Amino acid sequence: MDSDFSHAFQKELTCVICLNYLVDPVTICCGHSFCRPCLCLSWEEAQSPANCPACREPSPKMDFKTNILLKNLVTIARKASLWQFLSSEKQICGTHRQTKKMFCDMDKSLLCLLCSNSQEHGAHKHYPIEEAAEEDREKLLKQMRILWKKIQENQRNLYEERRTAFLLRGDVVLRAQMIRNEYRKLHPVLHKEEKQHLERLNKEYQEIFQQLQRSWVKMDQKSKHLKEMYQELMEMCHKPEVELLQDLGDIVARSESVLLHMPQPVNPELTAGPITGLVYRLNRFRVEISFHFEVTNHNIRLFEDVRSWMFRRGPLNSDRSDYFAAWGARVFSFGKHYWELDVDNSCDWALGVCNNSWIRKNSTMVNSEDIFLLLCLKVDNHFNLLTTSPVFPHYIEKPLGRVGVFLDFESGSVSFLNVTKSSLIWSYPAGSLTFPVRPFFYTGHR
């Protein structure tokens, strides 16, 4: 009966994925429990919601806390197995006829208490087997959590870089067409400068794309090494106490070395090529803009939308800066108009034009069709430029100093300029602007 009970007890504490005692056990929504490492590997590429490996029921939640009760029961079961092992005749000290309860860290042997204090072993470090094994297992689990975090981070970076390559290609194609259209407006047409501009754009794109490809290879290799190390640590965690202590070796140090030299994402940046006479020509339509300013933290959602949508980042800390929203006093509905805004002392900023209805609704939806904005947003340690209607990233260098805004109701277009470089950041296609708008400026100071 005792044997049947012991078998049933062990079965309830066994992971159905690895068929070993549960390690860092978690219980998912359907009630089944698994080793956290086993579940992580099982769900690594699963769609959300992932299915339970046992009953296939979908689990809307994918992040679980350690089941402390199960963890304690597994500890009890491991102790029982250890004492059963130590009670065998082989583990009785031949000299002192005592159970070998101590582990010698120097020669990786089991000793009785009297042997551990002998002249031969007295200078060595000794630990009770139970405590030493549990402590080492916790070290392994801690290292596995760090490894898994890095595995996920590396996978996210790899996904983002492949997505960046796709978006970069789209940006370059649209930018080349935009540059051609701008040069056609010049009289006389600067054919040589246009050709050089486009050749430089294509050359930079090819160089950046090759950087991205090399980065993908590094990230793939790092992902492979991290997973191999993670699985090696997991196998070590599953070993019985004595085997764990004897086989541990330098596995923790090796796992730490794998974490070194993590590949860093490539941040593409195209050079802002100057267009001769661009700012001079638009200055003919220069207007002075009067703004109504207000300090606000409400419209910080504008940047939160972009962060979550484009970069999959968490919310900004609304306490870290003052955000100034400003609307132009004048509404434009016809003609050509040009103005400049200084963004040199701003970290996150947005500028452009918006429909009156967008202001009245106090809307912050970045995907609204009522706004034509250029946004600069700092993500990690890199600045990103985007435009709205639709939201689209641009990989041109961040403008320093003043940014120009040009409204052309005759063609139905809005353009943004890097004034310092006399270059075009972005120009909406003809026919995009079909309603009255007023200037909008939004900035955060740190």
Swiss-Prot record:
ZnF start-end (B box-type): 88-129
Stretches assigned to the B30.2/SPRY domain: 269-446
Zinc finger residue extent: RING-type: 15-56
Presence of keyword Zinc-finger: yes
Molecular function (Gene Ontology), one example: ubiquitin protein ligase activity
Keyword terms: Coiled coil, Metal-binding, Zinc, Zinc-finger
Any single GO CC term annotated in Swiss-Prot or TrEMBL for this entry: cytoplasm
Gene3D superfamilies cross-referenced by the UniProt entry: 2.60.120.920, Classic Zinc Finger (3.30.160.60), Zinc/RING finger domain, C3HC4 (zinc finger) (3.30.40.10)
Binding site for Zn(2+): C93, H96, C115, H121
Parts forming coiled coils: 129-158, 190-220
GO terms for biological process, alphabetical: innate immune response; regulation of gene expression
CDD domains, per the entry: Bbox2_TRIM43-like, RING-HC_TRIM43-like_C-IV
InterPro entries from the UniProt entry: B30.2/SPRY, B30.2/SPRY_sf, Butyrophylin_SPRY, ConA-like_dom_sf, SPRY_dom, TRIM/RBCC, Znf_B-box, Znf_RING
UniProt entry tagged with the keyword Protease: no
Family: Belongs to the TRIM/RBCC family.
Name of the protein described by the UniProt record: Tripartite motif-containing protein 43B
Gene it is expressed from: TRIM43B
